[in-house]
Swiss-Prot record:
InterPro entries: ARID/SWI1_ChromRemod, ARID4A/B_PWWP, ARID4B_ARID/BRIGHT, ARID_dom, ARID_dom_sf, Chromo-like_dom_sf, Tudor, Tudor-knot. Residues 728-754, 1231-1270 form a coiled coil. The modification Phosphothreonine is found at residues 793, 1026, 1150. Residues 124-166, 266-306, 458-577, 635-680, 708-894, 909-1212, 1252-1288 are annotated as: Disordered. Keywords: Chromatin regulator, Coiled coil, Cytoplasm, DNA-binding, Isopeptide bond, Nucleus, Phosphoprotein, Transcription, Transcription regulation, Ubl conjugation. Residues 1038-1047, 1162-1191 have a biased composition (Polar residues). Residues 465-473, 1130-1137 are annotated as: Antigenic epitope. The modification Phosphoserine is found at residues 276, 295-296, 483, 666, 675, 717, 778, 790, 1014, 1029, 1152-1153, 1155, 1159. The lineage of its organism: Eukaryota, Metazoa, Chordata, Craniata, Vertebrata. Transmembrane segments: none annotated. It comes from Homo sapiens (Human). This is AT-rich interactive domain-containing protein 4B. Highly expressed in the testis and in breast, lung, colon, pancreatic and ovarian cancers. Expressed at low levels in the thymus, prostate and ovary. There is a cross-link at residues 429, 440, 462, 517, 751 (Glycyl lysine isopeptide (Lys-Gly) (interchain with G-Cter in SUMO2)).
Length: 1312
């Protein structure tokens, strides 16, 4: 406020403090546009007008008597009530800045920059906390304090004066007074009776200082009159009314006696009089009046216990004052006065503040208060108001056992005067007290049931309709946990001693889960519920939403898992939210802070990013458009119908660190490796979970292949659709498959026992290799192979036993599940492609896995062996132990890969197992020498160090110097490939933590992919993120194909041709044929549908390249391999590696010519060779395991591939979409149709993925070239040939400029 001597306006040149960016800075007035508004009261008639200062003669000072120019030009005497400086001042700051400001932004220099009125003491305490209620200056009485300085400046009354003023008004409030005024002609002094009311009662009339607001009994109008002209009247002191005022005077006396409001007031302001007569709460009541003018709702309510309300408020205000938090100003909420007593009762009715957890309930409280909901924060605001004003009091009342009459106000249409109301209310109170209490009790009881009843009714209805669903679900639920426990138990058992037991358990588990699976599949068939596919889920969700909700509620009531029944976005997730209505609707990014379920609706508490937290609000789920991250699938907010499978998945997702692709919310997966036992279990359960398992296994395989295809999310969804279609097709077939499974299970058990005994005798490592291939072979043959192999191997018992288990399971699975596999086979083809097609998630997984692998693999092989033994010793460390084991397997796989390359060559050429053993050491040396011959020592050294650093910057693995160690490594690698394939094939049992299994299988595959990371295959190490990794993947496929070739010995010539042709031109053909063959093998019982699918898809591009150079050689070798028998898988691996080396040597010379020849012969050989290959493969179903192993080979083939690719630069023609006729012939017409449709879909996706991959491949090629140059510059010789040398070679080959983007395309295609 201005000091009294402060001028009414400022002149140019005055030094001032002017507001600049919120702070007062020194400035000088440069120009002034003067405009002073003066409010004056004419002395003759007490009328008030506002004029400008140029119409006034006399000093411009509040209280001064001046002459004011009338409209007619005559001057009349008046008193200045108020001065307002509305001038515009342009000020210049010290630094030359200029700003035009109002007087309110200036103050005279030397004065305190903050006027007294601006201190916190002067501010109304409640204003800052009036959540959602901005400070509005329309109410003059309140506004006077919070108004701008100009008005306060010009009204020079101090705060003390203000308070005195208020006191006077308060004294007169609600009193009947006589107001004196002078008639216009100044001849007569007149008066009228009036009632003093609160200044807030009329928005239109501004009540000035020293004036009060009255309502005339004469005409019912509000008038602002000077305080000095008002005299209180009583029946004794009243002046004598004239005839005109007689009625008004009578009304005034009537009111004075009985508080009866004049009839003519009722329509306008019913509450005015009633509030004014309640003198104890005059101001509060008047405030209410003003609010209630605006809202008819409050007027209509009858307070059942007015005395109780006063008692309540009295105690509340006293409590708050004693507590040090007095309520100085009437609480306001949503522009209305807040009825604290009503709020207290409403909350009490709901069980108190602490019992109300939902924002929606608070919102209802807000509405029950009769306050219109202005914004979405209403519930939050009323909660805050309660917490501020009433929460402490509520607790105090509870502790002190203070109780109030809690009946809520009733709504009434016509209101009479307050006294009548009071009389009636007393009667009502007496009559209805008991009723009210009963009603209250019932209401409290019904609040919750009200929400629950409709749901329960629906639930009952639906349960009657579908009684079977619930029971099925329960069954499904019970089993998964059981199987989980069994798994854990099995893992913990000593692996050697309890092999057989484990297998028996597995088979029994298979039975159980098969039954479950059957039920689940029937259910799915009915409901169309493909829970594994997000899109299908969404469609199905629409149909089954209600049903799911109800069933979930029942189940969840039993489980006390109410929150879990709804699928919600997790806290912290960013989403796009619709805000506003109609044209004003906008999309904001918000993060979810909390979620809640209200009456069957999901509500989210969201924080709008970049906005103050005061804008946080609870919104309905339908306001959320989609997650901000477009890769995250949108959640349909409904209760999930938890199929056995879904529930398992959910649990696993919750407890496992990784969310797989099936998970709604995609998070980079963190995989743990399943132990061999787990793998075998997976094998057994494979068939059961054909639905979920197929998908999972496919995902896993794609991960295995390190599919780095960068495809659009659209492709993802397409793939999901395809998957959904496949699943639908398979649903029908799965039952038959299951029957086969059960029939085969007995065979499996017996076979397993035989195998286990023989395997125990033999070296388990080799047994693994042999077994994985030789399902088709007779047990004796297997034993022979095993014996041959066993001569070579020195292995840790633990590893051997694990491998043994894997191998046994592989073989048994293969033999026992031909049909199941066929079904899977189809899945695998399409699904592989599909999975590979969804690069985003898979890439993430692959990357994670690879990083893990790199770190782990970089450890020396001896370390890894130790780790393996440790892991075995501590079986309880399921995940860690498994991972360690896998790591060791990986590294061993690399080594074994090395030795295997040479060994394979020898075995293939000589076709004798013994020779293979004898020449292993030589072969290893050969491999190394060939690699070293190709690459300068410096580059090799550098590359090794590079790959090692890539593999977690750990020292390169020791070279395969120790034959025994290498052999064990080989076996390990093979085992690994087998086990992964096994795992891949085994879709996790429906109930048995499908997710953990998924994770494990994924990890296994990843590890396979990672094998290279240990150093042997830089292709895998580096490329997992790049399409080139697919090349390695393709290589694996190639190896698998090779294995298939080996299978068919008679077909050898054709196959060679086919292979060379395919490898050069149709890597895709080979892949497809391989896939088909794999399928056939699977149908015959081969164990890794997924495994091989992955390899198939990957091999198409990579393999062709490696095989070109060695067309004939590799083909013959493969044929010999097949003849080689049990060790064929090893041989295959080795042959791949050998081919890598050879390709490196020959590749540059032969590739171009080969590719030309192949392209020429291609079309012819394509169909025949494919068929022959597939048939051969069928005959030797054993070989599929080799394919499965291909992940291990993957890297090696990858090595070959790069070299071949560099020299040949040929575009692999993509006949990926061709397939073996033999496959088609074995299928029913429906199957054929679905497969063809899937192929078409894949082609479409493939085209899209190729487009994106071409670009990424170019980028990667450049990067690799750069790396190659750098490595050449810093080359150093490698101390010993280690697996990393291969990696280096692979890297170089990948990096070589000669590699055409087309060949890379092929790789990426295969990766798909």
């Amino acid at each position: 406020m201005k000091a009294l001597d402060e001028p009414p306006y400022l002149t140019v040149g005055t030094d001032v403090s002017a507001k600049y960016r919120g702070a007062f800075c020194e400035a000088k007035i440069k120009t002034a546009k003067r405009l002073v508004k003066v409010k004056v009261t004419f002395r003759h008639d007490s009328s008030t007008v506002e004029v400008q200062d140029d119409h006034i003669k006399g000093p411009l000072k509040v209280g001064a008597i001046v002459e004011v120019k009338n409209l007619d030009g005559a001057y009349q005497e008046a008193v200045i009530n108020k001065l307002t400086d509305a001038s515009w001042y342009t000020v210049v700051f010290d630094d030359g800045d200029e700003k035009t400001l109002r007087r309110s932004s200036l103050c005279l220099k030397g004065e305190r920059h903050f006027a007294e009125s601006e201190t916190l003491d002067q501010l109304p305490l409640t204003n800052p906390e009036h959540f959602g209620t901005p400070v509005i200056g329309k109410k003059t009485n309140r506004g006077r304090r919070s108004n701008h300085i100009p008005e306060e400046e010009s009204s020079s009354s101090s705060s003390d004066e203000d308070e005195d003023d208020r006191k006077q008004i308060d004294e007169l409030l609600g009193k009947v007074v006589c107001v004196d005024y002078i008639s216009l002609d100044k001849k007569k002094a007149l008066w009228f009776p009036a009632l003093v009311v609160c200044p807030d009662c009329s928005d239109e009339i501004a009540v000035k200082k020293d004036n009060i607001l009255v309502r005339s009994f004469k005409d019912g109008k509000f008038t602002s009159v000077p305080r000095k002209d008002v005299h209180e009247i009583t029946s004794d002191t009243a002046p004598k009314p004239d005839a005109v005022l007689k009625q008004a005077f009578e009304q005034a006396l009537e009111f004075h006696k009985s508080r009866t409001i004049p009839a003519n007031w009722k329509t306008e302001l019913k509450e005015d009089s009633s509030s004014s007569e309640a003198e104890e709460e005059e101001e509060e009541e008047d405030d209410e009046k003003e609010k209630e003018d605006n809202s008819s709702e409050e007027e209509e309510e009858i307070e059942p216990f007015p005395e109780e309300r006063e008692n309540f408020l009295q105690q509340l205000y006293k409590f708050m004052e004693d507590r040090g938090t007095p309520i100085n100003k009437r609480p306001v909420l949503g522009y209305r006065n807040l009825n604290l007593f009503k709020l207290f009762r409403l909350v009490h009715k709901l069980g108190g503040f602490d019992n109300i957890e939902s924002g929606a309930v608070w919102k209802q409280v807000y509405q029950d208060l009769g306050i219109p909901v202005l914004n979405s924060a209403a519930g939050y605001n009323v909660k805050c108001a309660y917490k501020k004003y009433l929460y402490g009091f509520e607790e105090y009342c509870r502790s002190a056992n203070i109780e109030f009459q809690m009946a809520l106000p009733e709504k009434v249409v016509n209101k009479q005067c307050k006294e009548c109301e009071n009389v009636k209310e007393i009667k009502v109170k007496e009559e209805n007290e008991t009723e009210i209490k009963e009603i209250k009790m019932e209401e409290e009881r019904n609040i919750i049931p009200r929400e629950e009843k409709p749901i329960e009714d629906e639930i009952e209805r639906k349960e009657n309709i579908k009684p079977s669903l619930g029971s099925k679900k329960n069954l499904l639920e019970s089993i998964p946990t059981h199987s989980d426990q069994e798994k854990e138990v099995n893992i913990k058992k000593p692996e050697d001693n309890e092999n057989l037991d484990d297998k028996d358990d597995d088979t029994t588990r298979v039975d159980e889960s098969l039954n479950i699976k059957v039920e689940a599949e029937e259910e799915k068939a009915k409901s169309g519920d493909e829970t594994n596919k997000e899109e299908d889920e969404d469609d199905e969700e629409a149909e089954e939403e209600e049903e799911e909700e109800e069933e979930e509620e029942d189940e969840d009531d039993d489980d006390n898992n109410e929150e879990e029944e709804f699928e919600c976005y997790p806290p912290g997730m960013k989403v796009q939210v619709r805000y506003g209505r109609g044209k004003n609707q906008k999309m904001y990014e918000a993060s979810i802070k909390d979620s809640d379920v209200e009456g069957g609706e999901v509500l989210y508490l969201v924080h709008y990013c970049g906005w103050n937290v005061r804008y946080d609000e609870w919104i309905k789920a339908d306001k959320i458009v989609r997650p901000a991250d477009k890769n995250v699938p949108k959640i349909k907010h409904r209760k999930k119908i938890k199929n056995k499978l879904d529930k398992e998945k959910d649990k696993d997702e919750k407890y496992s660190p990784k969310n797989c692709k099936l998970r709604r919310l995609s998070k980079p997966p963190f995989q743990t490796n399943p132990s061999p036992e787990m793998v075998s279990k997976l094998d057994l359960t494979d068939a059961k979970n054909s639905d979920t398992a197929h998908i999972k296994s496919i995902e896993i395989t794609s991960i295995l292949n390190g599919l780095q295809a960068s495809e659009s999310s659209a492709e993802d969804s397409e793939q999901e659709d395809e998957r959904g279609a496949q699943d639908m097709d398979n649903n029908g077939k799965e039952e038959s498959k299951i029957d086969h499974l059960t029939n085969n299970r007995n065979d499996l058990i017996s076979k397993e026992e035989q195998n286990s005994s023989s395997l125990l005798e033999e070296n388990k490592v080799h047994a693994d290799l042999v077994i994985s291939k030789p399902v088709s072979k007779s047990p004796e043959r297997l034993r022979k192979d095993i014996e041959v192999l066993s001569e070579d191997t020195d292995y840790e018992e633990d590893e051997v036993t694990k491998k043994r288990k894997d191998v046994k399971k592989d073989t048994t699975d293969k033999s026992s599940k031909p049909q199941i596999k066929r079904g899977k086979r189809r899945y695998c083809n399409t699904e592989e492609c599909l999975k590979t097609g969804s690069p985003g998630k898979k890439e993430e997984k692959a990357k994670n896995k690879e990083s893990l692998c790199m770190e782990n693999s970089s450890n020396s092989s001896s370390d890894e062996d130790e780790e393996e033994t440790k892991a075995k010793m501590t079986p309880t460390k399921k995940y860690n132990g498994l991972e360690e084991k896998r790591k060791s397997l990986r590294t061993t796989g690399f080594y074994s890969g090395f030795s295997e390359v040479a060994e394979k060559r020898i075995k293939l050429l000589n076709n004798s197992d013994e020779r293979l053993q004898n020449s292993r050491a030589k072969d290893r040396k050969d491999v190394w020498s060939s690699i070293q011959g190709q690459w300068p020592k410096k580059t090799l050294k550098e590359l090794f160090s590079d790959s090692d650093t890539e593999a977690a910057a750990s020292p390169p693995h020791p070279a395969p110097e120790e034959g025994v160690a290498e052999e064990s490594l080989q076996t390990v690698a093979e085992e690994e490939s087998c086990s992964p394939s096994v795992e891949l094939e085994k879709p996790p049992p429906v109930n048995v933590d499908s997710k953990p299994i998924e994770e494990k299988t994924v990890e296994v595959n990843d590890r396979k992919a990672e094998f290279p990371s240990s150093g042997s295959n830089s292709v895998l190490n580096t490329p997992p993120t790049t399409p080139e990794s697919p090349s390695s993947v393709t290589v694996t496929e190639g190896s698998r194909q090779q294995s298939s070739v080996t299978v068919s010995e008679p077909l050898a010539p054709n196959q060679e041709e086919v292979r060379s042709i395919k490898s050069e031109t149709d890597s895709t053909i080979e892949v497809d044929s391989v896939a088909g063959e794999l399928q056939d093998l699977q149908s015959e019982g081969n164990s890794s549908p997924a495994g091989f699918d992955a390899s198939v898809s990957s091999s198409s591009s990579n393999q062709p390249e490696p095989e070109h150079p060695e067309k004939a050689c590799t083909g013959q070798k493969r044929v010999k391999d097949a003849q080689g028998g049990g060790s064929s898988s090893k041989k295959q691996k080795r042959s791949h590696k050998a081919t890598v080396v050879n390709n490196k040597k020959k590749g540059k010379g032969t590739n171009s010519s080969d590719s030309e020849e192949l392209s020429a012969g291609e079309s012819i050989t394509k169909s025949q060779p494919v068929k022959s290959v597939s048939t051969g493969m069928k005959s030797h179903s054993t070989k599929s395991p080799a394919r499965t192993q291909s992940p291990g080979k993957c890297g090696k083939n990858g090595d070959k591939d790069p070299d071949l690719k560099e020299p040949s630069n040929r575009l692999p023609k993509v006949y990926k979409w061709s397939f073996q006729m033999s496959d088609l012939e074995n299928m029913t017409s429906a199957e054929r149709i679905t497969i063809l449709q899937e192929k078409l879909q894949e082609i479409r996706k493939h085209y899209l993925s190729l487009k994106s991959e071409v670009a990424s491949i170019d980028r990667r090629r450049k990067r690799l070239k750069k790396k190659e140059r750098e490595s050449a510059a810093t080359s150093s010789s490698s101390s010993s040939p280690s697996s990393s040398s291969i990696t280096a070679a692979v890297m170089l080959t990948l990096a070589e400029p000669s590699m055409s983007s087309a060949s890379q395309n092929g790789m990426s295609v295969e990766c798909r």
